[in-house]
């Protein structure tokens, strides 16, 4: 069965809002660490709800996406959140491109050379065979979210 995560956009929005708010209080450290923690918690919630309730991942993540979007609006009181110019490392150059490339290579490394990546490929190829090989399928599905 295919696993689809429809909450990625809401995850990015909520993590970005948290990052902007954290940068005001904690500087660069908050700007980097806060969205990582927020995204991890959101992924953990998605995975646990999917595994425990045995509902399609499409439905679970779509419903949770609405909750995350509502939290985003509640957090900002419906107003725009803008990152301070002092935290824009390369001025107007899209630092997102650099960060996206770093994230891509990191994820590619994890998927190709670690146990988590190998198990993820095994579960994606054939979940029954992966389970028969001794892979804790539920655990690695949660990690994948």
Briefly describe each language-model feature range.
Residues 1-25, 48-51:
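Single transmembrane alpha-helix segments in multi-pass membrane proteins
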Residues 2-4, 26-27, 53-55, 114, ...:
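Membrane-helix interface residues
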Residues 13-17, 39-40, 65-66, 104, ...:
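Residue-level recognition of pore/gate-forming positions within transmembrane alpha-helices
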Residues 16-17, 63-73, 129-134:
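Small-residue-rich segments of transmembrane alpha-helices in multi-pass membrane proteins
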Residues 17-22, 44-48, 70-71, 104-109:
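Alpha-helical transmembrane segments of multipass membrane proteins
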Residues 26-65:
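Alpha-helical transmembrane segments within multi-pass membrane transporters and channels
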Residues 29, 33-35, 41-46, 93-145:
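Helix-loop-helix "hairpin" substructures at the membrane interface of multi-pass membrane proteins
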Residues 53, 57-115, 140-143:
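Transmembrane helix-bundle core of multi-pass membrane transporters
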